């Protein structure tokens, strides 16, 4: 994914440096006819983009859109994986609570190091998006 991001950024940078292709279908006779009038008309560049896909603006828009899509997909993936992890922890805690209740139908109150598993609510435990914070210490957030 990092390679794609670097390639798209390089394409965005180089699209402004790449010269357009020359227009080859203009005949020399037309240029000879209009040489006298050329001084009166505003100068036009010698090279023009042949198709819309060759224009630098369109290339920049396409590469920029691809970059935004790539970053959005990455952020969406981070949020989805965090949400699925939270749901998995909540499900595991629910299974542990059911196991505790089935083992202690008499309402046993734990003492010492025995504890009934805690209830886990994703709406209060799930953290928001903090892309600048390291995601390597996720266990400390729960």
From Swiss-Prot:
Q: What happens when the gene is disrupted?
A: Decreases virulence in Zea mays.
Q: Which UniProt keywords apply?
A: Membrane, Signal, Transmembrane, Transmembrane helix, Virulence
Q: Where does the protein end up?
A: Membrane
A biological process (GO) of this protein is:
biological process involved in interaction with host
Q: Look up the signal peptide feature and give its range.
A: 1-20
What are the annotated disulfide bridges?
Answer: none
Protein's name in the database: Virulence-associated membrane protein 1
Source species of the chain: Mycosarcoma maydis (Corn smut fungus)
